[in-house]
From Swiss-Prot:
Keywords: Carbohydrate metabolism, Cytoplasm, Isomerase. The gene is rbsD. The lineage of its organism: Bacteria, Pseudomonadati, Pseudomonadota, Gammaproteobacteria, Vibrionales. The active site is at H20 (proton donor). GO terms for cellular component: cytosol. GO terms for biological process: D-ribose catabolic process. This is D-ribose pyranase. Homodecamer. The keyword Lipoprotein does not apply. It comes from Photobacterium profundum (strain SS9).
Length: 139
């Protein structure tokens, strides 16, 4: 369910049309995006927009109840992983609900993106900077 206003019309529309348990993926510049999945390509140049800035914008709009990440994210890019975890924990405090964290292999993550309503590509060039958000409800 949508919470606020985004400037990007395509992204705003996707968030507004999410139902309970629908998923979207936010990814780095290198994640392969399935042909059959809607691609919202925000990448301009390497590093713009960042993964974290994109996550913040989406969290400002979307109620989440679950998160899926690749196990490799925490191992290979621990600083960015911890920044994401901090945002998720803050979101839990703001919404007063527990958000489930799940980890899968990077290969399984890539397969899981096929279930996303959309994949949002950022300019992030940090390895494994990818997350799947599962939509929750605001009530």
């Amino acid at each position: 369910m949508k919470k606020n206003a985004l400037i990007n019309a395509e992204l705003s529309y996707v968030v507004a049309t999410l139902g309970h348990t629908d998923e979207i993926t936010i990814c780095d510049a290198g994640l392969p995006i399935p042909d059959e999945t809607q691609r919202i390509d925000l990448a301009l140049i390497p590093g713009v927009p960042t993964f974290i800035d994109t996550v913040k914008a989406v969290l400002g709009e979307m109620q989440i109840e679950g998160v899926v990440m690749a196990e490799e994210f925490a191992q290979v890019s621990p600083d960015l992983h911890q920044a994401l975890i901090a945002l998720i924990r803050n979101e839990e405090l703001l919404c007063g609900k527990k958000i489930t964290l799940s980890y899968v292999s990077h290969e399984a993550f890539k397969v899981h993106t096929q279930d996303s309503k959309a994949v949002i590509r950022t300019g992030e060039c940090t390895p494994y900077a990818n997350v799947i958000f599962q939509s929750g409800v605001v009530f």
